[in-house]
Amino acid sequence: MEPPDQCSQYMTSLLSPAVDDEKELQDMNAMVLSLTEEVKEEEEDAQPEPEQGTAAGEKLKSAGAQGGEEKDGGGEEKDGGGAGVPGHLWEGDLEGTSGSDGNVEDSDQSEKEPGQQYSRPQGAVGGLEPGNAQQPNVHAFTPLQLQELERIFQREQFPSEFLRRRLARSMNVTELAVQIWFENRRAKWRRHQRALMARNMLPFMAVGQPVMVTAAEAITAPLFISGMRDDYFWDHSHSSSLCFPMPPFPPPSLPLPLMLLPPMPPAGQAEFGPFPFVIVPSFTFPNV
């Protein structure tokens, strides 16, 4: 004979089919809810990043608002007080991130400023115009050093490299300074020589070129020289009757120097003295 407990369980299993159906329905509803939640999560993951960012921001704002309301309510419930903490933590994190971004920007600016400070002198140097280019530094020699350099220049205008190096070592200057001094001194000497040549050429340019006279004109010339005066210059009244041209005379403002004037002929040879022209022989041959 079976015990009474097993008999009661068997009887209840036979008499309660509706209870099993309700459990199956509850299990089905739970499975459907889990499937819907999974589908929603997949859709949220498939959303673009800006939308996810906005959704996360809205969630953070709502969490912060709930935390603030629960904090204002006095914190009677522990769960409410604990829920308000994450909102403040998120706000603190956001402020910390913003502060960190500001620090990063400040560090970037601090890193850029030294570069700008270093780049300013380069701009100042590179901004020079061609006309304002820096000239090489010229060493200022002492009077004794200048005398020594002049003495060497009078002896040798183009010193060798060995001599320049020895002078630079003895004067405690650079070889470049000695070379520049000799170059400037040679340029000055050339300018002085050109000025002397130009000054000596001016009187010769004022006198003019000699006149070319043929042999026939030279033979007939003494017949017309009787009108020559004692001062060796032609009279204006006789200049028109001569057959050969007169040499040009300088203007009154530029008198000839005494050293360039021709010598005065003696009184007895005034008529047949030396002539201020060149005689060119010319012969004619008879036609055969």
UniProtKB/Swiss-Prot annotation:
Tissue and organ distribution: Testis. Not detected in epididymis nor placenta. In testis, mainly expressed in germ cells, but also detected in somatic cells such as Sertoli cells, Leydig cells and peritubular cells.
What effect on the protein does mutating residue 68 to R have, as reported in its record?
A: Found in infertile men; uncertain significance; decreased induction of target genes expression
Listed under GO cellular component are:
chromatin; nucleus
Q: Where is the composition biased (Acidic residues)?
A: 39-48
Q: Which compartments is it annotated to reside in?
A: Nucleus
Q: Which SMART domains match?
A: HOX
Pfam families documented for this protein = Homeodomain
Q: What coarse category fits the chief subcellular location reported for this protein?
A: nucleus
- Classification via InterPro entries: HD, Homeobox_CS, Homeodomain-like_sf
The record lists the effect of residue 227 to R as: Found in infertile men; uncertain significance; decreased induction of target genes expression
Annotated GO MF terms: DNA-binding transcription factor activity, RNA polymerase II-specific; identical protein binding; RNA polymerase II transcription regulatory region sequence-specific DNA binding; sequence-specific double-stranded DNA binding
Keywords carried by this UniProt record: DNA-binding, Homeobox, Nucleus
Bias (Basic and acidic residues): 68-80
| Residue ranges, annotated region (Disordered) | 16-136
Identify the residue span(s) of motif Nuclear localization signal. Answer: 186-195
Could you tell me the Gene Ontology terms of the biological process aspect for this record? positive regulation of gene expression; regulation of transcription by RNA polymerase II
Return the annotated DNA-binding positions: 134-193
| Summary of the function given for this chain in its UniProt record | Transcription factor maybe involved in reproductive processes. Modulates expression of target genes encoding proteins involved in processes relevant to spermatogenesis.
Indicate the family of this protein: Belongs to the paired-like homeobox family. PEPP subfamily.
PANTHER family attached here?
A: MCG113260-RELATED-RELATED
Q: What is this protein called?
A: Rhox homeobox family member 2
Instruction: State the organism named in the record.
Output: Homo sapiens
At the highest ranks, the source species' classification is:
Eukaryota, Metazoa, Chordata, Craniata, Vertebrata
